[in-house]
């Protein structure tokens, strides 16, 4: 029996993959010459519907919320995290059924780990993604779907696919979860989906679109999906940095920032943000750095660089202002 290179094949058991001579082409599209006496091993192991086994990898804010959403739909969800407390929190809350000790036997592997450097949250670090890919490659079920919800830089998904030796499907569906507005911006909201190949896209749409009932915006390449999240957050970074620059200008020149901002925002196509405590958190600093790394390679100059300098200057500005206000308060109390 012979399957052509461009023909999608069934997702056979691990024992079948072990005995078949094969050479890798595109994900889920490989050529096999199968002797008749081995045909008995062939069967599709993909579970259907609510019987599918899901492993959420990373049980922080995003992974926990994903697992919670999936479990609320009656799906079979296990969890994996290097943090003991994260696993126990999810188990105690009933968000996951079991702690995964290994990655065997799952139909869907949903990666939700942080991609920032733990020593510097403003810098990306994707080593964890590739280490997980190595583990999935060793233990994962051939033909399963690896969904990357974590924010990643351009080219990461194809590298993951290579580590998996093209034996599993890979897609990227960057999360848009916002903890402060879970009702409107939770797990189920319009999400971008990109995939390494057409077979990967079919699996992605089946899982995220049909099983999880998430509205999807399909893009033609996985690189577009990878860029979407980092561009979204870089754009947000620029908006905040502009507000910070304006606030410093107002403070230093005696203009009321709030009044100016309110006046400007009466125009229908302008929305200047508030300037608060500087741009922090897990996402914006790190994601904008991913974008900066990309633009410096392909453009050279980047306004993100200037925005980062503005944010740093603004942090110093508000620190000085707090110190000045505190000093004036102390002097005022001393006079009294």
Regions found by a protein language model. Name each.
Residues 2, 12, 23, 32-52, ...:
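NAD(P)-dependent Rossmann-like dehydrogenase/reductase catalytic/cofactor-binding core
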Residues 23, 28, 32-99, 104, ...:
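NAD(P)+-binding Rossmann beta1-loop-alpha1 motif at the extreme N-terminus of oxidoreductases
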Residues 35, 40-46, 139, 162-173, ...:
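Internal alpha-helical scaffold of NAD(P)-dependent oxidoreductase catalytic cores
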Residues 110:
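N-terminal Rossmann-like NAD(P) cofactor-binding module of classical short-chain dehydrogenase/reductase
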Residues 113-114:
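Conserved NAD(P)H cofactor-binding loop of Rossmann-fold oxidoreductase domains
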Residues 117-179:
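Rossmann-like NAD(P)(H) cofactor-binding subdomain of soluble oxidoreductases
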